[in-house]
Amino acid sequence: MIIKCKMCGGDIDFIPGATYGTCEYCGSTSTIPQAEDENKLNRYNRANHFRRQCEFDKAVAAYEKILEQDDTDAEAHWGAVISRFGIEYVEDPATHQRIPTCHRVQVASILTDEDYLAAVENAPDEESRRIYQEEAARIAEIQKGILAISANEKPYDVFICYKETDENGQRTRDSQWAQDVYYGLTEQGLKVFFSRITLEDKLGQQYEPYIFAALNSAKVMVVIGSRPEYFNAVWVKNEWSRYLSLMKHDHKRLLIPCYRDMDPYDLPEELSMLQSQDMSKIGFMQDLRAGFRR
């Protein structure tokens, strides 16, 4: 049976019956699933694959499916919590070690998360428990740093969500239309988060504090897209799905899907129930601003 590394996706070298192993590719030592058969192991690898592809909602759902069969599965609880926090492991160019980056920071500490506590409680041995605790402590420090930066950010009125580049790395039309919306709204005196401009002086790994602050403060999200696959692109969906989660606890928030050159019936199912706007219609900006006041 093959177990894939949580850090890089390489094969884990382990002794049958062991609770942890070392990746043949990146050298990381990590806990491993206690899978009795290949089918269950494939479910772990699938969930892990989703997380490494930054498809965090799919990863959480996959781990929760495993937990439906056994809610004492420490490795599934751990997979669920690092997926919920959007943990991606990237290579440190200096040390070549894999370090965690957090793409979905939460206000509550990872150390108080129910899945983390369940992983520690149900760890199969002391070494696995130690690995969970040490890794969670690393993530908690990263979390503190992100929250400290985001606390200094002024609140936003609007968050614009869109796909910046296409499959060839070229700027999308969506980006151009999003910029038009950005200027139209800022002219009205609104503070707008538009990543192309808002994040232009930030480094890639420093994006999350500003995205987190903007998502949590903005009362309106505008999701712009011209293709179904752009609405469903990993980072686009990560933003609007996070905002939908916030809307569940704050009914004053508003999300407006804005489409162009596509059938509105092709919007993602989660967005299809919301009042959308056709960007090609005359008076689109006026209708958009009117939507803010509803």
Predicted regions and their residues:
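Short Cys/His-rich micro-motifs in 6-15 aa windows
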Residues: 27-36
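Conserved N-terminal substructure of TIR/SEFIR domains
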Residues: 137-224, 244-254, 261, 282-294
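Alpha-helical segment of the N-proximal tetratricopeptide repeat
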Residues: 38-65
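Residue-level recognition of tetratricopeptide repeat
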Residues: 56, 72-74
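Short coil/linker segments at helix-helix boundaries
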Residues: 86-135
